Amino acid sequence: MNYPNFKDVKTFKEAFVSNVENKYAIDFECSTPYQQYVVLGEMLRYNIAKDWHNTILETKKQKAKVVYYFSMEFLMGRMITNNLMNAGVYPVVKQAFDELGIDLNEVEHQETDAGLGNGGLGRLAACFMDSVASLGLPVHGNCIRYRYGFFEQGIRNGYQVEHPDRWLKDINVWEIRKDEESVEIPFYGYIDMNSENGKLQVEHKNAEYVKAVPYDIPIIGDNNHIVNTLRLWSAEPASVYPATDAFEYHRKLREISSMLYPNDETEEGKVLRLKQQYFFVSAGVINAIRRHKKIFKTVKNLDKKVVFHINDTHPALIVPELMRILVDEEHLEWDEAWKITKNCCAYTNHTILAEALEKWPLELFSRLLPRIYQITEEINRRFQNEIQAKYPDNQDKVKSMAIIYDGQVKMAHLAIAAGFSVNGVARLHTEILKHQELKEIILRLNMIMAIIYMFLLNKYHRLKNIMLVMQKILNYLP
């Protein structure tokens, strides 16, 4: 790879020693493995910056379809080794370190695992990002920049104890803060609607705003000069403070990007989880539409050029948020906005037990997200009307397929309703969804209703091959 500081062993050694001494104002012989890791990571990020920028420019130039992959987790692991290998510079660094008497493995182990994931959901998301970058596909991730990640476990006096995962206590050499792309996200308040010149005017009044600040991390493709982006959103004070206690406002907003999966057994915990989900979904969708409009000057072709991939139900609020932007801000008619929305969204389901499918109490949902609730309610009303028209004497079918029922908002039903592509994460998983847990939804819909929910059984496919799924999403034309 043509990276100036890594072109050969001699050049890299000189640049590396100089950078260590200049950054820390010490003799190189006195540098620690951690200091060497920081300099190595920063040098690599600096050298792949041109590829990163060129990847963005080439996507714009080609007017290519772009996937925005939303997940509450990205279990990335240590990135330094993978990045060195994908950039094609690992052999140069290894030989240079051997000649300098540095143990590369020890330097690699100075990196703290990014506290962005906990299990299979996050590992799948991380594999997606690595694979699609290596395939040269324009796919960019969205997540929260959790300060403390999940938690670390230990044993004390024979008992398990948990500690915060302070993965950001040291420098994150990969991230770049992008203040200019910050977004302010509203919570609470109430909605005032009126008509002006035949157009619906919606105003969110008395809202409590939180600023979402993006931090970008490069995802380097395997020896192909492609660098995609994982964007992490951090919660900070908005430009206008709410008319409440400032200390309480700061405490609550800091919690949004504090940790992965806060305890939701309490009312406050439920509010925080729903806040987290809307926070990064709204910021990511707004940002994606801004980028799209800079290139195409319109949102009417959004479904031809953008896909929002919903990784499990946590980002399912993409559906009403996209509708909100298209109807309230872009002033599209509902039917046109809904057509665009359901041709933009793809959904991966990770849960096979019906009782574990994510649901939100209606009162909490409507209080925290008043406009999103109104839109979700309208999606549900229209869908139920169509089911009712087909099965006028069978209310059980209507109830079993409803997005909102019995005081709950069913997020999996919402994601399926708007998804042009729905899949499980394994063949068995998908079969269980089709024939057991979501059987009522799938088997009771005719071809007309399948346009709204899924193309009958064919809309479900297993996640057998990351490449095939992403190619299908990128090549999809409604």
Where are these regions (language model features)?
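A conserved ligand/cofactor-binding region detector
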Residues: M1-P478
